[in-house]
Design a protein with these regions (language model features):
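Amphipathic alpha-helical interface segments
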Residues: 36, 40, 111, 175-182, ...
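Amphipathic alpha-helical packing segments from all-alpha helical-bundle domains
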Residues: 88, 134-174, 192-199
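Generic hydrophobic, amphipathic alpha-helix propensity
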Residues: 29-37, 54, 79-87, 91, ...
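Arg/Lys-rich, glycine/proline-spaced intrinsically disordered segments
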Residues: 15-20
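C-terminal peripheral helix-coil segments that are non-catalytic and often amphipathic
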Residues: 1-14, 148-161, 181-232
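Amphipathic alpha-helical segments used for helix-helix packing
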Residues: 104-107, 115-138, 152, 170-173, ...
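Hydrophobic alpha-helical connector segments
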Residues: 78, 92-118
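Helix-turn-helix
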Residues: 32, 40-74, 78
Length: 232
């Protein structure tokens, strides 16, 4: 399906004022557009959602939406980027960071699972859209593949440390993304869920040590509170 493109009359200027007071969370119109699009894409489908409907949900004119995003595909790309870019940045730091591989993978798994759990909308469900197979979204597919490779490299290092099964190296990435299916099944997550996933990821790679130091270090690195009942 082709992308909706910017009308010539809408490309000039900085967009018209809002039709009414903001209806969406976010401090900028761009954030509010992304929130509305995320709800519509995840709940009603990408193909059936028009830019006009997104604009209506935000309370702006369609021409104002085009000031922020030239096409509907650009909106989808921005939403998808928010699910991988921060984890990819953190993962790149952790690959060359200090500490055991188990600690570094634990940090990445908790951080990545937290953002997938905490998002207002289940954006990971958009990974299965047929539109993502087109050339337009090749850069996103590449970034996600790079994140998967970061997980694999850290997992390989954990396996080497712990004498775990080499065939399990891809499983931590899959375990973290299981959050997407959990949310799709309308199962409400808990604050401890990312930590449980991170523990499972390490155990499946052969780690059988004490998790308390890992939890403490991960919480400190991410600036978050550890679960009330930390993994053992």
């Amino acid at each position: 399906m082709g992308a909706e493109t910017t009308p010539a009359s809408a490309s000039a200027g900085r967009g018209r004022p809002r039709l009414e007071r903001p209806r969406r969370p976010g401090t900028t119109a761009r954030e509010q557009i992304l929130d509305a699009a995320a709800e519509l894409f995840t709940n009603h489908g990408y193909a059936s959602t028009s830019t006009r409907r997104i604009a209506d949900e935000v309370g702006v004119r369609q021409a104002s939406l085009y000031h922020h995003f030239a096409t509907k595909d650009d909106i989808l790309d921005a939403l998808l980027a928010g699910t991988v870019d921060e984890a990819l940045r953190l993962g790149a730091e952790l690959l060359d960071g200090a500490g055991t591989a188990a600690q570094r993978l634990h940090i990445l798994a908790v951080a990545d699972a937290r953002q997938l759990c905490a998002g207002r909308w289940n954006l990971g469900a958009l990974y299965l859209l047929p539109e993502l197979r087109t050339d337009r979204f090749a850069p996103f597919r590449q970034r996600r593949a790079e994140l998967r490779e970061v997980y694999r490299r850290l997992s390989d290092a954990v396996i080497a440390e712990c004498g775990g099964p080499p065939a399990a190296a891809d499983l931590p990435f899959r375990l973290v993304e299981s959050v997407v299916n959990t949310r799709s099944d309308e199962v409400e997550g808990t604050p401890a869920q990312p930590w449980v996933i991170a523990e499972a990821a390490l155990r499946i790679l052969g780690f059988d040590g004490d998790f308390s130091p890992l939890v403490t270090a991960t919480a400190a690195r991410l600036g978050v509170r550890p679960p009330q009942t930390p993994a053992r």
